[in-house]
Amino acid sequence: MNSRSGYIHIILGPMFSGKSTELIRLLKRYQVAMYTCLVIKYSKDERYGRGLVTHDNDSVPAIPVNSLNEINCNDINADVIGIDEGQFFPDIVEFCDYMANNGKILIVAALDGTFLRQPFGNILNLIPRAEYVLKLTAVCMICFGSASFSKRISDEQEIEIIGGKEKYQSVCRVCYFKINN
């Protein structure tokens, strides 16, 4: 373990809840404080090119990878590591735990549940190892109440379908169970 204290900060929530926006906000705050930051994004999310881009078009440069083990942990010189779409990385727990134990600050933005309201990937296993966990809500795109869930509105049945408003809605509990929107 490194003598400098690292930690893990997780930002969870449904689609359109501002997870990536909050991740970028925190990263920019660390940059103002003269911390060096590295941003990692899921390589199969090609909606906005190589960088991390929010639905509001705020952006930061990012390294696209399929798996976190593609990154040589010993070569990371950054103080802070931001990871977007953390639910897609099967090695998220081991990577974050190792890096935090070696003095790095990890900020992970991720969906907590699938469109079926099931745990998404390995991300919930990271919670017991995290110092900070924030669960955001969105606005229900049907009734405009508070939304905690992502509902797929396209016909695909695979868990990993990357998309935006053309494929998903943020919904509340009541609207999640409505058949026709």
From Swiss-Prot:
| The keyword Lipoprotein is assigned to this record | no
* Keywords associated with the record: ATP-binding, DNA synthesis, Kinase, Metal-binding, Nucleotide-binding, Transferase, Zinc
**Chain coiled-coil ranges:** none
Where does this protein hold ATP? Answer: G13, P14, M15, F16, S17, G18, K19, S20
Asked if Oxidoreductase is a keyword of the record, the answer is: no
InterPro entries per UniProt: P-loop_NTPase, Thymidine_kinase, Thymidine_kinase_CS
UniProt enzyme class: transferase
| Residue numbers binding Zn(2+) | C140, C143, C172, C175
EC number of this enzyme: 2.7.1.21
Binding residues for substrate: F115, I159, E160, I161, I162, G163
Family under the similarity heading: Belongs to the thymidine kinase family.
Q: Protein name, please? A: Thymidine kinase
Organism expressing this protein natively: Yaba monkey tumor virus (strain VR587)
